Amino acid sequence: MKAVVVGSGGWGTALSMVLCDNGHDVTLWSHDPAKAAEMAKTRENSKLKGVRLPDSLKISGDLDCLKGAELVISATPSFAVRETGKKIAPYLTPETVLVSVSKGIERDTNLRMSQILAEVTGNICKVAALSGPSHAEEVSIRMPTGCVSACPDLKVARLVQDAFMNDYFRVYTSEDIVGVELSAAMKNVVALACGVCDGMGYQDNTKALLMTRAMAELTRLGEKLGGTRQTFGGLAGMGDLIVTCTSMHSRNRRAGILIGQGKSAQEAMTEVGAVVEGYYAAESIYQLSQREGVEMPLCRSVYEVLYHGVAVQDVVSSLMRRAKKDELTETTWL
């Protein structure tokens, strides 16, 4: 199968390596021709230091590499999905399968990544999402990893499963692309919050409370938007939440630690030196919760800290002093 991975960051590069290991004809596209040339020469991506790129992997800065591609992976940062989607649209056909692996919600429109791709490509082809607890640093050295391929058309989800699955990269399928993509976006917000806890010196009890109650908020919003409850307890939901909230591979968590230590959100993102998706997702998730009338006190608190400069200690006190309630009812997780 001819596959093109659009976006040469760590995640796009790691996925291109998986596809190469599976014997596909793979090209990794970079928006920066100079970077593409450097990677082709050194067989290394600076985002994955010490990892040699497969000799079979072609690397290009020319969009013409998309001609004839059967599988196209959209692996750009969430803020670049719309612009890049417009650029690749002319190369897609009804037979192409387009897979979003970006994690986020678009600012202002509050669209999921697959929705943006479907819109800017004129729904010319099927769009799936691939997501789960999967740090690029670990996938690139072939650590056992599991993800979920999601598409309302299960045949498409299974095609993606077949393309990626091997003895170190296990892929499950799902029809719930809403739940999978929403989980991918919100876990970055929660990882930021967990990092703040670390930066302030809070310990395991606090982070367990945060992660569990955040999952309740995700489930409430996700079901309201059409997601399936079971998705949020699976790899794309709880699995990705755990790995992002507990690992120093997570730039969202690293940014949160700096905020907890007293840095501003902008200072923290500058110091991390990479895209902190949770910063942008926090605003979008807050807007979605307001639009849908879903109570999400944790996500609202993260939004207030990031965008309005509210003191972390003040939001912690406010959250802990909320009105008493039962944890569960017959119909919902409160």
List where the protein language model places each region.
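Rossmann-fold dinucleotide-binding core
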Residues: 105-203
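NAD(P)+-binding Rossmann beta1-loop-alpha1 motif at the extreme N-terminus of oxidoreductases
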Residues: 1-52, 58-61
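Rossmann-like NAD(P)(H) cofactor-binding subdomain of soluble oxidoreductases
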Residues: 53, 59-142, 160
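Ligand/cofactor pocket segment of small-molecule handling proteins
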Residues: 205-208, 212
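NAD(P)-dependent Rossmann-like dehydrogenase/reductase catalytic/cofactor-binding core
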Residues: 187, 194-198, 223-233, 237-334
